[in-house]
Amino acid sequence: MAVCIIDHDNIRGVIYFEPVHGKDKVLGSVIGLKSGTYSLIIHRYGDISQGCDSIGSPEIFIGNIFVNRYGVAYVYLDTDVNIFTIIGKALSISKNDQRLACEVIGISYINEKIIHFLTINENGV
């Protein structure tokens, strides 16, 4: 599983990339945006040293999220993205090609436990 913890200005949230029943899903929630439709986009680099200006070009459009009148978006999207190819890249929340928030996608703590468990079982330990 991969995770992106968003904490950019007043925009906050958590987005998970995980397999659910054999399909990859994007799950989470975001707060702090105005009501409307926004895009989730994976960018080439995970370099946020200069904010969203240094994350490179857009590579993968994940889908649109819809923010309600209370400023909350609940995310539940299907994706064909291979989770392990996006770790270390940046995820942006954009509207009209303007990047409003961006953070780096990392490996989640839960994923490390699963990998450790599978390694133990494969070695017969």
From Swiss-Prot:
InterPro entries: SOD-like_Cu/Zn_dom_sf
GO biological process, alphabetically ordered: superoxide metabolic process
GO molecular function list: metal ion binding
Disulfide topology: 52-102
GO cellular component, as recorded: host cell cytoplasm; virion component
UniProt superkingdom: Viruses
Family affiliation: Belongs to the Cu-Zn superoxide dismutase family.
Protein name, UniProt field: Cu-Zn superoxide dismutase-like protein OPG175
Lineage: Viruses, Varidnaviria, Bamfordvirae, Nucleocytoviricota, Pokkesviricetes
